[in-house]
């Protein structure tokens, strides 16, 4: 032990606890090490351990442990226990003033345990509370999970993400430690509530609303649609809140009524002419087909690559099914999730020359985990994907960012750098691109969001009366991707309340990475392969040099110095995100001007 320490006894005890924490590989190592260093460096002699609270790293709990240790040491060695400095000062002041001792404070009652809403302990207590209070038999783990899962936002069987190993079931340990639950039986363990556990469960049950907690159900009030999941509900007023999703505003006076979405409608579908109260769109030359509200159902479509892990590919679809949503899983050319209107009559669209019976809705989700977002920023996919989303013509793009554990030391330079990168990416996505950014805690939170969005779109397009109209742009009247975007822009400007779209197969062809690419598209994609060349910068270069050949020939006409500065000099009048510096100009010249 260091002879220079002013309080060697206290230092020795802290060292003992530090060594014990290291042996147990406990998280307390950091706490004890900090306290040890502070005590070792302190030049003051403490008469009582409570005086050590003034040191960095020594809090009330640690000082209390030191006091207990000192008390035991004094008793063992027949020494008087030093008086607490505050009590000594108070008794001295009292004796000086001749005033009686004030009454002792009543000990503060420990607060009753209250688990967080829809947490693991919360769900387990409610699951066990389904038993009769006087029942002698408990529930097995499998039985309890089945009853508790509807009350919990996290899964009892699968970790929140592949990098973690705990599930909501791990919270059973907390309930056992607090003696709210007891287990009995071997080898098949059964669980039941103790008397204290029943008291907590009864308090929780008083806060529960009526109804089935295992469904995402619609409940309509005056002017409000409530999409409920358990006892946590997201209220979506008829003017759609951005907390649920971006999008057009609905009429506040709409009364929401439940409609059957099973598509068993025997009545023939009648086409509504688009000249009802509107002028024909002569200048566009397009005649959209209006789909009646009762002629289709809303279907969620997921990309085949949207999986929980390589060994658990059906987790997302299975969890959505539990919430009453049966998704379609197929390869998507763009985005990770989207919604289509599937016609109840499979032959309805074929009479207009369409090869598909599904019409795209104006909503698409691009899902990114934190680690995937960082990777896409580094390799340029982030800007390329946003560029393709912008060219897709989809009006409501939801950029969903899912939290994920990233192994970096908090406070390190790399962690700070990555945090800045993500903050900048999120801000640019919202401000520059105008996309709605939704952040979720984990995959289960993402699944709940997709379910709520599906119900919201069903309400918008399928309920009677519908708040939104869906119109199909015939594929035969579109000649290219550019004509599709131009047509969309003009139709939306003419009637913003109508959703104009194309069939799913047409949309897939228009947004394909390889099919129907013009020379301009190929040139832009080639430019964006260079790190630092965003979609905006690529467009600026393409406007100045129309083709790759023209771009290369421009380099060939210059000497080496001229090639390095060519892009910078020819585009230096540009401002904002389109502006290119000399470093980027040289990088482009190294790629495109080599051998000129």
UniProtKB/Swiss-Prot annotation:
It is found in: Nucleus. Its cofactor is Mg(2+). InterPro entries: DNA_pol_lamdba_lyase_dom_sf, EME1/EME2_C, ERCC4_domain, Mus81, Restrct_endonuc-II-like, WH-like_DNA-bd_sf, WH_MUS81, XPF_nuclease_Mus81. CDD domains: WH_MUS81 (cd21036), XPF_nuclease_Mus81 (cd20074). It comes from the Eukaryota. Interacts with eme1. Belongs to the XPF family. This is Crossover junction endonuclease mus81. It comes from Aspergillus fumigatus (strain ATCC MYA-4609 / CBS 101355 / FGSC A1100 / Af293). The gene is mus81.
